[in-house]
Design a protein with these regions (language model features):
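A glycine-rich phosphate-binding loop feature that marks nucleotide/adenosyl-phosphate handling sites
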Residues: 265-270
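Acidic catalytic motifs of isoprenoid enzymes
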Residues: 1-173, 177-190, 201-234, 238-240, ...
Length: 292
């Protein structure tokens, strides 16, 4: 996951935004406590969504605690769900996914990026090992995705559906694990599968120019020969992304969301469409690094 699953702040109630921030801050705190203070740098909106959704469908007690930001002690924070199982799972999935993303950067990145990736690799490897010991099922799902993706990318002309399949299957598997019965498994599998496709496609579109310049794999590159093709591709991608987003949202609507529904609705109905418009039709490259 790559930081695209965001809220649309202007459309949230103030209390909902404060709650979202408290989940985001709690995930940051959990990463630091469970792995390392430096693990906080892999904090992302995607896993904030995962934590909110997991806590939203489970009946675990959720506490709100006041504290101070580790990076800015002058800043007061509220932490939601720190220490509960769902938050720990979100943190573990964060470090496991970050580790395999780092391996991908080493394989495909530029020289400068490869050197930086090699330097931090031992830290990521240690965090991943610890997370994998606690949640081997997450390690298995993400590892399988990474291997499958590597095989798929050997064929530069592979179909876009085939290229998105590893990410889609991984997220379907991970989301399934949050279910408590067979019906929920089907719902969360569909939700995760189509959200995984959306994430893969939006990332591929966002990286299109960079991949073209660096000679990296991108399933959309074969469709571009001139500027007109580029504009037509954006329209096509918009349709593909809309389909994946709608199918994931349809599955989400079948889930029994017990809390944070306003936030989760905002992500699906406002946040994802905003990110999609920004990546496809906005100016410049999408920025996923802005902190709350």
């Amino acid at each position: 996951m790559f930081g695209y699953v965001q809220i649309e702040k202007s459309e949230l109630l103030v209390k909902e935004y404060e709650t979202y921030k408290s989940i985001y801050c709690a995930l940051c705190k959990t990463l630091g406590k469970e792995y390392s203070v430096f693990a906080r740098f892999i904090l992302s909106y995607d896993f904030t969504f995962f934590a909110a959704l997991s806590m939203g469908v489970h009946n675990q007690k959720v506490c709100f605690n006041k504290g101070r930001c580790t990076f800015n002690p002058l800043k007061k924070c509220v932490f939601c769900g720190t220490g509960n199982d769902d938050m720990k799972k979100a943190a573990a999935l964060s470090v496991i996914t970050a580790f395999y993303k780092l391996k991908d950067d080493i394989r495909d990145g530029r020289t400068g990026k490869k050197i930086c990736s090699y330097l931090v690799y031992p830290f990521f490897s240690r965090w991943r090992k610890k997370a994998a010991q606690k949640y081997p099922e997450y390690e298995e799902a993400v590892s399988a995705m990474s291997q499958m993706q590597e095989q798929v990318e050997e064929d530069q002309m592979c179909h876009i559906d085939m290229a998105a399949e590893p990410t889609a299957k991984m997220l379907a598997s991970v989301m399934e694990m949050q279910a408590k019965d067979e019906m929920e498994k089907r719902i969360f599998s569909e939700l995760g599968y189509h959200l995984g496709r959306w994430i893969y496609f939006i990332d591929a579109v966002d990286d299109l120019e960079k991949d073209k310049k660096d000679g990296n794999f991108n399933p959309f590159l074969k469709y571009i020969k001139d500027e007109e093709d580029n504009e037509n591709l954006k329209k096509y991608c918009n349709e593909v992304l809309n389909q994946s987003m709608c199918l994931s949202y349809n599955a989400y609507n079948l889930a029994d969301i017990k809390r944070f529904k306003g936030i989760l609705d905002n992500i699906y109905l406002k946040g994802l469409p905003f990110v999609q418009r920004k990546v496809l039709f906005g100016k410049g490259e999408f920025n996923d690094e802005e902190s709350l």
